[in-house]
Amino acid sequence: MSTDEAQKPSKTYDASCHCGSIKLSLTLSPPLEDGHKVLNCNCSICRRSGYLLVYPEKKDVTWHDGSRERCTNYRFNTKTKDQMFCGSCGSSLGIDFLNETYYGISARTIDGIDLDTLTYKKLDGLNKVSPAQDLSGTGTKEAST
């Protein structure tokens, strides 16, 4: 590890669903308070899930007491991403990119942060990301945006 990496500021946050059944901790560098960018995307899944995403490495996320296994997952289109939510209270938790080394965790789940003070990066996913096309799995429905 280089000296720059060793001195890079980071902070660990606790996060959870609304009912508390799903709990995790994630470490971000730089910390949210120091301008860590939060993705605000307008694609169909981000809009409907209310996602404001941060992207910690999987090694920097700790799921407590089997919480990841208790997540309910939804997959569509390429079926390579789990949209994770709590099966009890329905809170949208984020995205498990199954073939990647990172998660997309919804900043809305992080305890004790003020969403109005965060630094956002907007993404026009509605117009710049390829449409999911058939979301039904039957080959008959058009994409819903």
Q: Across the structure, where does each feature detected by a protein language model lie?
A:
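A short Gly-Trp-Pro
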Residues: 1-16, 21-145
